[in-house]
Curated annotation (Swiss-Prot):
Lineage: Eukaryota, Metazoa, Chordata, Craniata, Vertebrata
UniProt cross-references to InterPro entries, sorted A to Z: EF-hand-dom_pair (IPR011992), EF_Hand_1_Ca_BS (IPR018247), EF_hand_dom (IPR002048), Nucleobindin (IPR040250)
Binding site for Ca(2+) 1: 252, 254, 256, 263
Subcellular location: Golgi apparatus, cis-Golgi network membrane; Cytoplasm; Secreted
Domains as described in the record: The EF-hand domains are unfolded in the absence of Ca(2+) and fold upon Ca(2+) addition. The GBA (G-alpha binding and activating) motif mediates binding to the alpha subunits of guanine nucleotide-binding proteins (G proteins).
Organism from which the protein derives: Mus musculus (Mouse)
Stretches the record annotates as Disordered: 192-220, 368-459
UniProt-recorded name of the protein: Nucleobindin-1
Gene expressing this chain: Nucb1
Length: 459
């Protein structure tokens, strides 16, 4: 019989790496009044580049009564295979309209991303086939960019399921590269030191490693010893009265009937605190997060029998009946006891770093040469600018000189003075100006000839 969808888990995909079947699950009890929690926990980001679109689609689908009923009767396989997607044809018009708008917004967002990507890599005038590029986004149907159809929901479910399943592997690969880079830098640092300094640095490193290894025994995650320790130290209960069912209910924080990945990882905190302390120089918090992920994967592998990334009460109780539950041997092997890389992998990584460094150096050299060329060009432009300014100044000065030479002279009071022509008769000076001239030299104006007077009698 297929496993039914767990009730009360509408947002379980949104904690990192959970299946979409958990996301779309809804509470069975319709009579239960909605709980108003003003301080509700914000749903964590899945890390998917379409996380917001996924969250909004889920929120809209939850508002449709028909779809919720079908979800209650569905199983994880129906959801993952896309069978449930066909029920989208029966949702209300209002819900379909909202889904259509969400898809148009997502297509618009992806187009903007593509444009930015192409602008950064290619010539600005290059024509881009956005329709073809949209096909690389597998969580929606690029052939229909305006309406949200059953195919869109099917693609969204399948893509999210696949991407989330690959998330852990990507995290492990990232951690491996982090560890290799750390070792590479450590070796380069030691090579840069003198012999005495190198010996001192190596001694200090060995001392840090020794302190890091000195910690209490770490219990195997999911074992009886590990769960009892949580029961006693975290829950404050009597270890002799350990009850798996009660334990499950206590740590099902959101009371949805399953332990999701975040709820499981919370159980490992006490074990991690035995090994890692943020105050200690020798303890790497990146290693602690890798340790947490490895612990969760171990529990899921041994307890999550249907591999839906959720632990039901039945699965949890069944795991407590196995022999491995009580027999943990020497305990859990931590990260430093299980190297993340081999020497051969480190060698290839260093070759890759060397090639990248050479490429960056060549690029830096080209940029330096271009900068120098630009500097020389700038100097030439500045010199030409100064020459042009000097030429303009000289032209202005010459123009001013020409204007001064062509203008008539002015009297002391600023009035213009015009010169008389030399060929004209001299103009006598005003009377006031002749007072200093000798009387003998003064010219008397000639009198007109006197006409004879006629006698009126002769007329």
């Amino acid at each position: 019989m297929p496993t039914s969808v767990p009730r009360g888990a509408p947002f379980l995909l949104l904690p990192p790496l959970l299946m979409l079947s958990a996301v779309l699950a809804v509470p069975v009890d319709r009579a239960a009044p909605p709980q108003e929690d003003s301080q509700a926990t914000e749903t964590p980001d899945t890390g998917l580049y379409y996380h917001r679109y996924l969250q909004e689609v889920i929120n809209v689908l939850e508002t449709d009564g028909h779809f919720r009923e079908k979800l209650q009767a569905a199983n994880a396989e129906d959801i993952k295979s896309g069978k449930l997607s066909q029920e989208l044809d029966f949702v209300s018009h209002n819900v379909r309209t909202k889904l259509d708008e969400l898809k148009r917004q997502e297509v618009s967002r992806l187009r903007m991303l593509l444009k930015a990507k192409m602008d950064a890599k290619q010539e600005p005038n290059l024509q881009v086939d956005h329709m073809n590029l949209l096909k690389q986004f597998e969580h929606l149907d690029p052939q229909n960019q305006h309406t949200f159809e059953a195919r869109d929901l099917e693609l969204l479910i399948q893509t999210a399921t696949r991407d989330l399943a690959q998330y852990d592997a990507a995290h492990h690969e990232e951690f491996k590269r982090y560890e290799m880079l750390k070792e590479h830098e450590r070796r380069r640092y030691l090579e840069s030191l003198g012999e005495e300094q190198r010996k001192e640095a190596e001694r200090k490193l060995q001392e840090q490693q020794r302190r890091h290894r000195e910690h209490p025994k770490v219990n195997v995650p999911g074992s009886q010893a590990q769960l009892k320790e949580v029961w006693e130290e975290l829950d404050g209960l009597d270890p002799n009265r350990f009850n798996p069912k009660t334990f499950f209910i206590l740590h099902d924080i959101n009371s949805d009937g399953v332990l999701d990945e975040q709820e499981l990882e919370a159980l490992f905190t006490k074990e991690l605190e035995k090994v890692y302390d943020p105050k200690n120089e020798e303890d790497d918090m990146r290693e602690m997060e890798e340790e947490r992920l490895r612990m969760r994967e171990h529990v899921m592998k041994n307890v999550d029998t249907n591999q839906d990334r959720l632990v039901t009460l039945e699965e949890f109780l069944a795991s407590t009946q196995r022999k491995e539950f009580g027999d943990t041997g020497e305990g859990w092997k931590t990260v430093e006891m299980s190297p993340a890389y081999t020497e051969e992998e480190l060698k290839r990584f260093e070759e890759e770093l060397a090639a990248r460094e050479a490429e960056l150096n060549a690029r830096a050299q080209r940029l330096s040469q271009e900068t120098e060329a630009l500097g020389r060009s700038q100097d030439r432009l500045e010199a030409q600018k100064r020459e042009l300014q000097q030429a303009v100044l000289q032209m202005e000065q010459r123009k001013q000189q020409l204007q001064e030479q062509s203008a008539p002279p002015s009297k002391p009071d600023g009035q213009l003075q015009f010169r008389a022509d030399t060929d004209d008769a001299p103009v006598p000076a005003p009377a006031g100006d002749q007072k200093d001239v000798p009387a003998s030299e003064k010219k008397v104006p000639e009198q007109p000839p006197e006409l004879p007077q006629l006698d009126s009698q002769h007329l």
